[in-house]
Structure formats: C-alpha cells, structure tokens
Amino acid sequence: MLITFDEFLARLKQLGAVYRDVAPRTAKYPYWIYTYTNTQRLVASTGTRLIVNEYQVSLFTKGVEDELLPFIKKFDDVPFESFRGIPGDENDETITDLYTYIEVIAGGQ
C-alpha cells in the first residue's frame, strides 16, 4: 500500500528527530534524514494515473541495527527496500548511516 507524503512524514516524526536533506551540527544521535531521489508517473491508456515520489530515508546512529525495529513496525504496511548500512567517522566517533528507499504518493493527489 502506498501512503501520502503527509502520512509518511507524520509516521517518521513519531520515531524521533527528523530532518530533510541535512541535520544541523547540533543534532543528537540517533536522528532520521529523508532526501528526495526521484519521481515516477504511473500511466494507463488514459494518461497519468498517479505520481509517486521516492525518498531515501536514513537513520544516523552510534547504535546498532536494532534501532531500525520501530521504523519497520511503523511502516509495516508500506513497501520499502531492505536497509543497508555505511559506517563512517564523524568527530572521532563511529557513526552508521542505515538507509532504505520508500515510495509515497506525491502531494496534492
């Protein structure tokens, strides 16, 4: 089931701190970032039926993958890709970017 962007954002905000594209330097871990990646048109013989936007959703954390469980439960009814992880170093701390991609119905539909 696809959800609207407003529903996506409301659910994400229930999980903790959420930022679009970049977090402020003062943000405390863990936090979520969502970033627009692309738009698709779902078409039929009568024209465009639905416009769907894709977002990358990232959890930046000093913790472990178990921190993904609340997201998985909150979005259980919405298809999203398997999470991937990229370790990194930030201010001499090991930080992990756990990310997925999710599609939502574009605003105004």
Which residue stretches match the model-derived regions?
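Small/polar-rich, solvent-exposed N-terminal microdomains that initiate assembly or binding
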Residues: 1-47, 62
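A short beta-turn/loop motif at secondary-structure boundaries
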Residues: 24-27, 49, 89-94
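Short, surface-exposed linear patches
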Residues: 40-42, 54-58, 78-82
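Short intrinsically disordered coil segments
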Residues: 47-52, 72-75
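Compact nucleic-acid interaction/catalytic patches
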Residues: 66
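Acidic-leaning, charged glycine-interspersed low-complexity segments
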Residues: 70-109
